[in-house]
C-alpha cells in the first residue's frame, strides 16, 4: 500500500447532491482538507462539469465529496478514458447512499474520512467490467428493484465537451426513486468461467456477484426458487460471469441497467486505487 504525504495537492470535487443533502458535512470536509493539504475546491453544477473538472485534474489527487453515485461516476469516467489505473481516488462520503463506500473501507463520518484522505494509504481494488464498458465497484444484483425510470440530462454541443458527450450522457442518467419490491422469479443461465452454474430450467429468485474475492476472483451466489423449504444457494467463484435468458435488469452498485438478454462481467484485478485509513 502506498502512503500519502500532507504536501500532496488535492482536487476536492463536491458533488451538487452532497451540498443539497448535508451542507454541514461538506463544510467540515472542506475545512479539514484545506487545513491539512494544498486543496483546490471545485463545486460542479452537474455531471458534465463534474467530468470536466476531473479531466483537468493534472497532478492533483482527486477527492470526491458525495455519495456512492458520485464515486461510481468518477470511477466510470476514468475507466472509460483509460486513466483509472494511474489515478488514486479518495472520498468523503456525504449523502444518502453510502453503502458501497463503507463496504470498500471508507469511513462514513466526514471528519474521519477527511483525515483518511490526508493520512491514509492506497488500497488497490478489483473491478467488474461488463461487455458494454460498465463497471461494478461493490455488488451486482439480479433482479434489481421492480420499477425504475431514468432521466437523461441534456448536454451542450460545443466546446470542451464534444469528445466526451456520449460518455457524460451515459453517466448523467440517474434512476428515479423506486419502491423496494422484489421482481418475479427469472429463468436465467449463469456461467462462471464458461461452466454452467444454473440453467434455464431452474427459476431463480436472485443472483449476486461481488468482486474482491480471494485470488482476484468474483464471488457468485445464485438463489434458486424454492417451494416450501428454503433452497440452498449455489455459490461459485471465477474471473468471468455470464448471465443470459429472457430480458432482465440488474443493479450495479447504485444504478440500474437493462433490459438485456445477455451480459458478461470480467474481473480486473487491482484495477483502481482508493485511499483508506492506515492500519495504525
Positions of predicted regions on the chain:
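Soluble catalytic domains of membrane acyltransferases
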Residues: 49-55, 76, 80, 130-131
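Hydrophobic alpha-helical membrane segments, chiefly transmembrane helices and signal peptide h-regions
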Residues: 11-14, 63-67, 74-75, 89-94, ...
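ATP/NTP phosphate-donor binding region
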Residues: 1-65, 72, 111-115, 274, ...
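ATP/nucleoside-binding phosphotransfer catalytic cores, i.e., glycine-rich phosphate-binding loops
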Residues: 201-280
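Catalytic core of DAGKc-family lipid kinases
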Residues: 83-207, 211
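Short Gly/Thr/Asp-enriched flexible loops that form oxyanion-binding sites at enzyme active sites
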Residues: 69-83
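Short solvent-exposed loop/turn micro-motifs enriched in small/polar/acidic residues
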Residues: 57, 120-122, 181-183, 234-236, ...
Amino acid at each position: 500500500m502506498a502512503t500519502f504525504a500532507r504536501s500532496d495537492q488535492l482536487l476536492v470535487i463536491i458533488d451538487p447532491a452532497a451540498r443539497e443533502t448535508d451542507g454541514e458535512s461538506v463544510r467540515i470536509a472542506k475545512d479539514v482538507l484545506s487545513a491539512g493539504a494544498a486543496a483546490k475546491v471545485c463545486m460542479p453544477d452537474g455531471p458534465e462539469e463534474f467530468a470536466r473538472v476531473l479531466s483537468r485534474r493534472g497532478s492533483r489527487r482527486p477527492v470526491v465529496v458525495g455519495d456512492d453515485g458520485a464515486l461510481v461516476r468518477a470511477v466510470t469516467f476514468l475507466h472509460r478514458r483509460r486513466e483509472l489505473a494511474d489515478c488514486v481516488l479518495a472520498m468523503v462520503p456525504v449523502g444518502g447512499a453510502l453503502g458501497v463506500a463503507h463496504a470498500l473501507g471508507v469511513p462514513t463520518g466526514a471528519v474521519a474520512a477527511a483525515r483518511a484522505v490526508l493520512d491514509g494509504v492506497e488500497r488497490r481494488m478489483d473491478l467488474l467490467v461488463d461487455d458494454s464498458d460498465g463497471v461494478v465497484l461493490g455488488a451486482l444484483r439480479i433482479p434489481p428493484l421492480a420499477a425504475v425510470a431514468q432521466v437523461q440530462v441534456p448536454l451542450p454541443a460545443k466546446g470542451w465537451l464534444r469528445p466526451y458527450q456520449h460518455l457524460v450522457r451515459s453517466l448523467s442518467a440517474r434512476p428515479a426513486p423506486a419502491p423496494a419490491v422484489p421482481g418475479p422469479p427469472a429463468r436465467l443461465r449463469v456461467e462462471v468461467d464458461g461452466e454452467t452454474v444454473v440453467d434455464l430450467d431452474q427459476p431463480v429468485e436472485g443472483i449476486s456477484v461481488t468482486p474482491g474475492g480471494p485470488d482476484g476472483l468474483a464471488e457468485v451466489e445464485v438463489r434458486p426458487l424454492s417451494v416450501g423449504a428454503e433452497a440452498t444457494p449455489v455459490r461459485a467463484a471465477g474471473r468471468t460471469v455470464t448471465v443470459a435468458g429472457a430480458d432482465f435488469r440488474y443493479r450495479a452498485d447504485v444504478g440500474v441497467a437493462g433490459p438485456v438478454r445477455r451480459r458478461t462481467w470480467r474481473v480486473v484485478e487491482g484495477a483502481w486505487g482508493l485511499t483508506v485509513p492506515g492500519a495504525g
